[in-house]
């Protein structure tokens, strides 16, 4: 089982992942929790390059670095874990590439699809939970109750977060378009709902879609 979480930073992905891991643990299901970029020695080094605010990276260079990190994670961790029957919860996967590099950076979609196919080895999530939040609200939530968009009481932003509001508006539009194209796999949730409400919806959907997963015979 591969469960992925998507959304712009500040939408609450990490919180919902922790809630889900705890809930699964109570049912005796031990989940492997991973993140993108990262998850292997090489992928973590790539993550540092991608997020370091002093590094200037071209859009195509950014795409290839994210994809290289993903390829390492898929080959070294995800494929073996899925083959052994483990449950994986992944903070970001290829939908982030479509939204961020496709819609955000404007990279050709055909090129994106080709590179995604290579980096994922054709692996697709069983279900994706997308926490939808407007960029302005996400930045407020993450850094300050009042400041938008790029100066938050002295807290330094990483390179991706410095891309600006228009970039994140395009990213959100990308996610919403993915929802239209893949309505069943890609589940949209309102990130402004209380944590417990979102968590309850996630558990309900997992139980509905995969009854033998949460309620094994």
From Swiss-Prot:
Its EC number is 2.7.4.9. It catalyses: dTMP + ATP = dTDP + ADP. One of its GO terms (biological process) is dUDP biosynthetic process. It is an enzyme of class 2 (transferase). GO terms for molecular function: ATP binding; dTMP kinase activity. ATP binds at residues 7-14. One of its GO terms (cellular component) is cytosol. It holds the Pfam family Thymidylate_kin. Keywords: ATP-binding, Kinase, Nucleotide biosynthesis, Nucleotide-binding, Transferase. Belongs to the thymidylate kinase family. Phosphorylation of dTMP to form dTDP in both de novo and salvage pathways of dTTP synthesis. This is Thymidylate kinase. It comes from Pelodictyon phaeoclathratiforme (strain DSM 5477 / BU-1). The gene is tmk.
């Amino acid at each position: 089982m591969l469960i992925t979480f998507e959304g712009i930073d500040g939408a609450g992905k990490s919180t919902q992942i922790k809630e889900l891991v705890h809930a699964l643990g109570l049912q005796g299901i031990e989940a492997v929790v991973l993140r993108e970029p990262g998850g292997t020695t090489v992928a973590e080094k790539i993550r540092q390059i991608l997020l370091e605010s002093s590094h200037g990276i071209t859009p195509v260079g950014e795409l290839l670095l994210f994809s290289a990190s993903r390829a390492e994670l898929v080959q070294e961790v995800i494929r073996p874990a899925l083959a052994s029957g483990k449950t994986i919860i992944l903070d970001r996967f290829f939908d982030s590439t479509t939204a961020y590099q496709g819609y955000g950076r404007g990279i050709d979609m055909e090129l994106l699809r080709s590179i995604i196919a290579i980096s994922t080895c054709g692996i697709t999530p069983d279900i994706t939970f997308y926490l939808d939040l407007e960029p302005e609200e996400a930045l407020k939530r993450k850094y300050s109750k009042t400041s938008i968009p790029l100066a938050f009481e002295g807290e330094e932003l990483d390179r991706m977060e410095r891309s600006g509001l228009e970039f994140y508006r395009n990213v959100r539009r990308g996610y919403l378009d993915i929802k239209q194209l893949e309505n069943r796999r890609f589940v949209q949730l309102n990130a402004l709902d209380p944590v417990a409400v979102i968590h309850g919806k996630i558990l309900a959907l997992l139980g509905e879609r995969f009854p033998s997963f949460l309620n094994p015979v």
